[in-house]
């Protein structure tokens, strides 16, 4: 469907054939962001979970996400469980962003609706160590980098390894396989 739609959109400009770059169906995204959803039971106890908006802008709670990389899939539940055990890490947590790589380097940005202090820094450092990730805390006009705000990536392009550094907040192609194919297409054409 998409291929035919795009051919029609470009039909006034070209009749050339399109080279199609295909993606995997699952476990292909190395970048993802999720809202945090707070749920209270009848006794006032709360739980937190990851959430997204569906097509109608309704909240969709999720406990897993099959399109993210296996490493992100593995870290998601562990991270949420550990955060939920520490009030300082959990308090007013609004969203979580993941930026991963093929080297299993993973940067997690925790976004809050409150100012982050020294107590948060100490617990975030412990969380980094327990989960083996890099953490950044963000809130309005604040960015707390616990160890560093970048990750290492290694891509094999035309049978040669290239090393990259991806920085938090910068653009990265979230689909590593598509990224490699796009770069190879440019180099080969």
Stretches found by the model and what they are:
Residues 1-189:
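Accessory RNA-recognition modules of RNA-modification enzymes
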